[in-house]
Amino acid sequence: MKRLIPLLLAAATLCGCRPAVSDYAIVAGPGIADDPAWSEVVAALRQSHPGAALLSYTEAPDEALPALRELAPRYVAFVDRPEQIGRDYIIALNRMARAVDGDSYDDYLWGVVTGYNAAAARRMVEAAREPLTVRSAVSTLREVGCGKWFDAFAYVDDRTPGLCGEKRPGADSVTHYMTTRTLADGRPDLLRCFCDFYAAYDPDLITTASHATERNLEMPFSVGNLRARDGALYADFPEGPEPLHETGKRRVFLPIGNCLIGNVNRTRESMAVAWMNSAHAAAMMGYVVPTWYGRNGWGGLKYWLTTPGRYTLAEAFYLNRQDMLHWLDYRG
């Protein structure tokens, strides 16, 4: 199974609901409880979820597993500094989620709360007390190019170089066209198109594909990059870097077709942390391994988009994983 990182807030914070006492557990990483700033992140979570159980670990997250088996929570939030979070950490959390009882399915909805610093992590927790309804999107996916789920939408196509589309507020459908923006070598300037769409539509949702690493996000056909520096995203244009235009609104970032971009890589200078910090991503799902075709990502997106309003983002990805696990069990 391809590993996907459910970053930021655990499922209940995205639901806009308050689970019953003991339905929510918080697992604090090494030194979190003793750090005045990071302990405030935990306190903010407990304020959002009264009665939440508080657990901790010192060496490995699975130290909390015996207590989780006893509590049997429905939601678990792991609070850690970026320097603690990497590929192996996420793999361990995926395995833990299936280890509370004896079957092969996930036993709780979970996510990671982190940030460029403690203040950024706390800001996300506090902002998530109000549910986020997605009405607008910017994308680099042909798969969502019809834009039918959104009131406003724009995309850069990842199969036909230079093809773009826009659905302006009030329009019934997407208008497709070939961009006239070009680079000095004649290739379409897809990075400029994407950044202009981002600024103009101020999207609630961003979905992306094409190459990526922990340090960059390529536009389709390798025409330009978004990069991270000092916890902020910028466009790496030939004429010089430009910060990605931000308004401070919360967003959802789903790099469904990108390798590695979900891997925090044990540093706060990663792309994942920059999306949380400067782009105010309130929810993010991303791969921590080299893949662009995993069912964990594409399937979760399909569960969420094809039943609009039925599931929260966290619920959609959770249900997709259970579907995958059932299929794997069935195939033996």
Across the structure, where does each feature detected by a protein language model lie?
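Bacterial Sec-dependent signal peptides at the C-terminal "C-region" and cleavage site
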Residues: 9-22
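Sec-dependent signal peptide recognition
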Residues: 2-8
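Cysteine-dependent hydrolase recognition
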Residues: 20-332
